[in-house]
Amino acid sequence: MNYKQNLEDDPRKKLQRGLDNRHVQLIALGGAIGTGLFMGSGKTISVAGPSIILVYAIIGCALYFVMRAMGELLLSNSQYRSLVDFSTDMLGPGIAFFVGWSYWLSWVVTGAADIIAIITYMHFWWPTLNPWVVVFSCIGFFLVFNLFAVKMFGELEFWFGLIKIVAILVLIVVGFYMIVTGFTSPNGTVASLNHVWNDGNIFPRGITGFFAGFQIAIFSFVGIEIAGTTAAEVKDPKTVLPKAINAIPVRIVFFYIFSLIVIMSVTPWDQVIPDRSPFVEMFWLAGIPIAAGLVNFVVLTSAASSANSGIFSTSRMIYGLATQKGAPRVLGKLSKYHVPANALFFSCLCILLGYTITSLSPSIISAFTIVTSISAIAFLFVWSVILVSYIVYRRSRPQLHAKSVYKMPGGVIACWAILAFFAFMLYLLTLEHDTFIAFKYSLVWFAFLGVTYFIFLRKKTAKENE
């Protein structure tokens, strides 16, 4: 099967390559560092203890291989613009339909969750602020930066990513200084790396606690693949994408591992408060009185970055589906600024609907957990399809792999190993009540997609192939 784009040859009707190397580097960084690190790391530390460092390292390593597989696939054919394109080519339009719409859903529900988070952070300064003012302001703001040129989106994500980097760098520097100087906390605890080793017992909660850490930590990596969705809008993808992907392990080690080591060195794992940000606690212990306000600003921009990335990703995914006849044709139209404006408006409306449904829940926390779990399950499916596409690519296009200058390390064997790991992650997500509910909702979603494809698209596709 030879892949053919369903796009016009007119360059005015194609996505514009407006993203520079610095944009993609920070977009990739923003995708690898989510709100979960700033706000959720306290819970992961309390659940898993020092072994949480291994949890983040294992998940990060697995997703690095996913990104390498995606990178080789995207660069093997200049016509590939996203995972929908290579999954269509390798696995057929049916799987591409599933993965495209599932990826879209994952970012829609993530966007709704991000809006909830932004409202919470805004209430830190303005407790009586009407939530709907925040909702419409956020969506309007992100629309402006996405409607006119892809470079505007890139600039916004660049600065959002820079804020994250600075915040984590400051934490690591301040924490390292506290360790070196033997800082003593008000309760008499002396900062030391010995707290991380925990007298040789890095699994204080046992294997159960270690596995529980995966359930929470997986959410922190949602969006790591977003750099791949920019392939059609990067000025020099063959140079820029490998740089962005190759830097992922360094970023994970530096920003996740180092920050967790510093946090647990200053505050022993069993003294970390689960429902508080360990970043806030660190700055407070260091005597920075405006720590809460500073970290609130950082997590606010982190949630805003995630929502903005979600709007970008959903619009490009819908655009790709529309050009492959997996979505209404009108959603595949580009504006004079070379952006899929109709797809942007459609995705924003769905994010608004998602927030509305979530806000009606009697328990916002429970609803938040469910929607983020649905997102994580959808992402596990998407990441798995990337790996399966790579396995098929290696079998059916050996000549392309032989010519590739960006080969995935480990090849097919690594793909199967990571697929087994993802299956285990899915099993872990069924062990908790809220995440099991999300699992059942996800099954309903896949059943809905199956019925939709069979009724509306399967026969149409078969006729066109005759």
Residues covered by each model-derived region:
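Membrane-interface "cap" regions at the ends of multi-pass membrane proteins
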Residues: 1-41, 46-51, 64, 68, ...
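Helix-loop-helix connectors at the membrane interface of multi-pass transporters/channels
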Residues: 3-8, 84-90, 94, 114-135, ...
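Helix-loop-helix junctions that connect adjacent transmembrane segments
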Residues: 3-6, 10-11, 15, 52-53, ...
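Membrane-interface loop-to-helix entry segments
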Residues: 119, 133-191, 222, 245-249, ...
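Extracellular loop-to-transmembrane helix junctions
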Residues: 16, 39-134, 144, 250-253, ...
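Membrane-helix boundary/coupling elements in multi-pass transport proteins
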Residues: 79-80, 102-117, 221-234, 292-329, ...
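TM-loop-TM module centered on a large, flexible mid-protein loop between adjacent transmembrane helices
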Residues: 85-88, 92, 124, 197-200, ...
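C-terminal membrane-solvent junction of multi-pass transporters and transport-like membrane proteins
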Residues: 160, 330-341, 380-434
